[in-house]
Each structure stands twice: as C-alpha cells, then as structure tokens.
From Swiss-Prot:
One of its GO terms (biological process) is regulation of translational termination. GO terms for molecular function: GTP binding; GTPase activity; guanosine tetraphosphate binding; translation release factor activity, codon nonspecific; translation release factor activity, codon specific. This is Peptide chain release factor 3. Belongs to the TRAFAC class translation factor GTPase superfamily. Classic translation factor GTPase family. PrfC subfamily. Residues 8-277 form the tr-type G domain. It comes from Actinobacillus pleuropneumoniae serotype 5b (strain L20). It is found in: Cytoplasm.
Length: 526
C-alpha cells in the first residue's frame, strides 16, 4: 500500500466524558468490534479477574477507573483506528488535556440519565483550542433516561455545538427496544443480556412497516413516528464540513454495557472523521502527507511493564513513516538517536513496531532524556507547539517516613513530574518538597507509585500554597531584583523552571501589581 493510502486510512481519536458515564465500557466494546479482544470483561467486576483491558495500573485495578492514558490500535471498516483512552476521573485533567493534543477527533460519551456534566464541559473547552471534530454517543439507554430532545437541546445550549441525530431511540430502561437510523430508514432491534459479545441484530426496513409495530408494539412504534416528525423539523441535518470544523456533532444513541449502538458511531467515525491532520511548529506547518518523519511526545508513562523499571514516551507521528532502526533527531537536545525498539500498544500488551505512519502512536524507551513536548524529526530543526503544562490548583508538602531515602524520593518525584503525573516544586529557601496537582486523586496515585515503584514510603502535610505561576522577565536586572526580594515565594519545578508560589490569591495579585515587568504564566509550553 502506498504512503498516502496508509495515512488516509488512519483515524486517531480519544473518548471524553464525565466520570462514570461509561467511557471504559465503550472502550471495551470498541475493541471487541475491532477484534482486539474476544469477550469484553465486565468493568463492574472489580473483584473478578476480568478487568477492563484498558485499565492496567495496580491502583486502577482496585478502583475501577482509568488513571493512565493507554493507546489501542485496531482495524475497522478498512481503516486503522487508534484509540487513546483518557483518564475519566475528576482528577486527571492535565493528562487528559494533553492527550487531546494528540488526536484528530473525539467521541463524547454522555450518560443519558444525567445529560451534560461538568468534566465534559471542561474537556470540550480543550478540544476547542484546535476545533477538534466531535461525535456524540448518548449512553445507558437500558436505564431510564431524560427526554432525548431535551438532551440534544442541552448539548447545543451548554456546549455551543449543533446536534445532528443519526439514530433515534425507541423506548428506554426495561422498555428499550432499539434505535432507528434516520438516513438509512432502518430500525435495529435490541436484545438484552448480550453485552459481552457482538450480537446479530435484527433489522426492520422502513418506518411505516407493520413489522416494526409487531416488533416493538403499537404504542412505541407510533411514539417513534411522532418523535421523528418533531426531530426532523427541529434538529439539524448532518453537515460534513460543519462537523470537520467542530461546529456540529453527529449524535448516536445506545447502551455500551448492552453492546448496542457502538458499531453505529464506529461507522460514523471511519466514514466522517478526518484522516491525520497537519500540525503547527515554531517555524512552519507540517502536513501529514509529507514523507519525512516528524512527531511529538505528549505523554510519558513510567513502569508500563512491572517486570521492567522502564519509562515509555508516547509519540504522535505527525508525518512520514517510522521504520525500525531509523535515525531521528531529538531536537531539544540536538542529538541524533537510532530508534530500533519502538513499541505499538494494545493496552497493557506491548509489541515492537516494525513501522508506523502519520496518525499512529508509538512508544519510545526513555531513560530520562525525553520530556513531554519533545519533537523528533529526520534532521529538521523545529518544535511542535500547543502541548501545555497547566498551573496546579492543589498543593501538599510531601515528607518521608524514613529520612534516609531523600535521594530516592527526589528521583521518583522528578520522574513522575516528567511524565505529567504531578508537578514538583522545590522552594529556594528550604529543603521542602511541594507537590502540585490538578485533582486530589493524583496525590494518592503519587504516594502509591512511590511505594510500589521506588520503595519509598511518603506522607503528605498541609502547606500554605494556594496557587503557582511560572515567572519570566526580559530585563535581567529587574528579574534579579524580583528574585532577591521574593525569595521566600520562589521555587524550582521539576524542570528547574522558576515558579512563584503564592500563599493566597491576594498575595499573587499584589505581586503582579508590584512587578509589572515580570510575566506570571498560568500555562507553560513544554
């Protein structure tokens, strides 16, 4: 197959949702359709051996939530789909934000009983930075749900994106009978209890068919016909250009747990979602059709293999083709490296990559030299932009139970900060170590990983820090004066960048007023 054909058949997407909307279950079912797994392990079985294939760190297994971003590749409809699983829980936004920089489209999963929730709103804001196309799956139709028209109205008003329903539900909860495909004029009938395998779905042709009344009952059939008249009058038709520009979302209804409706949005994804897109660098735009290799690192994961204490850098291929043993330039450090052992992923199972094309995600073994945001090329000096660090909102001081392990603690924290699990700050005035996170659960993750991966037992204490900003100044003399007078509020982060740590927002505002020549940044490009 030629290079353009390889690139054109790729679809790289992430699933975004509020915690517990069913994202991990959908991930499972998608893999089932892609023949990547044989039976879907029910995610609810926390104590059973059938853990969801994409949740594989120790703590995730105990809690049943996806903490790390894993990558899964599978074939579907003559396309090669790369699915980036993103942490769904409240507290993992920073990793999730960065993962959204590495995809070309997103699937938004909504719990149909609850509608649009807070985390979904935040994540959609991040996709807006790049106008990422969004598909929508209204989940949990096997439970009692809100009125479908209401759900569409809420998405449109809260998320400011037009909805184009592709399928429409027939009943819900115990009365859920299936969905009607508007464009194809076909009804797909639902059978409960078939969730862990791909079921043969009975299809009824035509909305006016008596077979439809016989299958779902007169009441539901008539209700469907009435609702569809309303829908076709009140909602938008699918418009591909508006979808590509992130202005309109095709909406599918179904139940991930019952494995029903998942294939409909997969068909939509492979047919409508964009092939690998162009990316900005600090010098030019790189097109996916270019044959020279380039890519950027958006995540670093420690110890994916419990048997090996290694770290893997996840790289999005932007252009060209990776081939085993090729020489690439690691732009930030100006060094050429031979990559002979890149990995491809199937959540927890790793395989050595012989080749990878634009749109694919590969893993590079990292012995401490690769950082988030690093660019690799076939010689060209450029840096991909738009992979930010976000100022933490929560802070704790971290302390050792055994003071002799200070060196291991620092090493563990710096490694965890490089992979984006947490941010570390070392105040200039004392030997404290302060950990900053975007959500509470990250603190638990850090303590548990320090224990299992670095054999360090640590505990947290409260610390008088409310917020942090990265500080820079073009005038060296003024910067020195600022540093001299504010030493008690300054710290170095894991990458040795100077940071202002403020005990209160009032303190930060005063500092910004007092030093107008100093730039205080809420995000920092990697």
């Amino acid at each position: 197959m030629s290079y353009p054909q390889e690139v054109n058949k790729r679809r790289t997407f992430a699933i975004i949702s509020h915690p517990d909307a069913g994202k991990t279950t959908i991930t499972e079912k998608v893999l089932l359709y892609g023949n990547a797994i044989q039976t879907a392990g029910s995610v609810k079985g926390k104590g059973s051996s059938a853990h969801a294939k994409s949740d594989w760190m120790e703590m995730e297994k105990q809690r049943g939530i996806s903490i790390t971003t894993s990558v899964m590749q599978f074939p579907y409809n003559n396309c090669l789909v790369n699915l980036l699983d993103t942490p769904g829980h409240e507290d993992f936004s920073e990793d999730t934000y960065r993962t959204l920089t590495a995809v070309d489209s997103c699937l938004m999963v909504i719990d149909s009983a609850k509608g649009v929730e807070e985390r979904t709103i935040k994540l959609i804001e991040v996709t807006r930075l790049r106008d990422t196309p969004i598909l929508t799956f209204m989940n949990k139709l096997d439970r009692d749900i809100r009125d479908p028209m209401e759900l569409l109205d809420e998405v449109e008003s809260v998320l400011k994106i037009r909805c184009a329903p592709i399928t429409w539900p027939i009943g819900c909860g115990k009365l859920f009978k299936g969905v009607y495909h508007i464009a194809k004029d076909e009804t797909y009938l639902y059978q409960s209890g078939q969730g862990s395998t791909i079921q043969e779905v009975r299809i009824v042709k035509g909305l006016s068919s008596p077979e439809l009344d016989a299958a779902v009952g007169d009441d539901l059939a008539n209700q469907l016909r009435e609702e569809l008249e309303l829908v076709q009058g009140a909602s938008n038709e699918f418009d591909h250009e508006a979808f590509i520009n992130g202005e309109l979302t095709p909406v599918f209804f179904g139940t991930a747990l019952g494995n029903f409706g998942v294939d409909h949005f997969l068909d939509g994804l492979t047919e409508w979602a964009p092939k690998p897109q162009a990316r900005q660098t600090d010098v030019r735009t790189v097109e996916s059709s270019e044959e020279k290799f380039s890519g950027f690192v958006f995540k670093i994961q420690a110890n994916m293999d419990p048997k090996h204490r290694d770290r893997v850098a996840f790289m999005r291929v932007v252009s060209g083709k990776y081939e085993k043993g090729m020489k690439l330039k690691h732009v930030r450090i100006g060094k050429d490296v031979v990559i002979s052992d890149a990995l491809t992923f199937m959540a927890g199972d790793r395989a050595h990559a012989e080749e990878a094309y634009a749109g694919d995600i590969i893993g590079l073994h990292n012995h401490g030299t690769i950082q988030i945001g690093d660019t690799f090329t076939q010689g060209e000096v450029m840096k991909f932009t738009g992979i930010p660090n976000f100022a933490p909102e929560l802070f704790r001081r971290i302390r050792l139970k055994d003071p002799l392990k200070q060196k291991q603690l620092l090493k563990g924290l710096v490694q965890l900060s490089e992979e984006g699990a947490v941010q570390v700050f070392r105040p200039l005035m004392n030997n404290d170590l302060i950990v900053g996170a975007v959500g509470v659960l990250q603190f638990d993750v850090v303590v548990s990983r320090l224990k299992t991966e670095y054999n360090v037992e640590a505990i947290y204490e409260a610390v008088n820090v409310a917020t942090a900003r990265w500080v820079e100044c073009g005038d060296a003399k003024k910067f020195e004066e600022f540093k001299r007078k504010n030493e008690q509020n300054l710290a170095l982060d894991g990458g040795d960048n100077l940071t202002y740590i403020a005990p209160t927002m009032v303190n930060l505002n005063l500092a910004q007023e007092r030093y107008p020549d100093i730039n205080f940044f809420k995000t920092r490009e990697h």
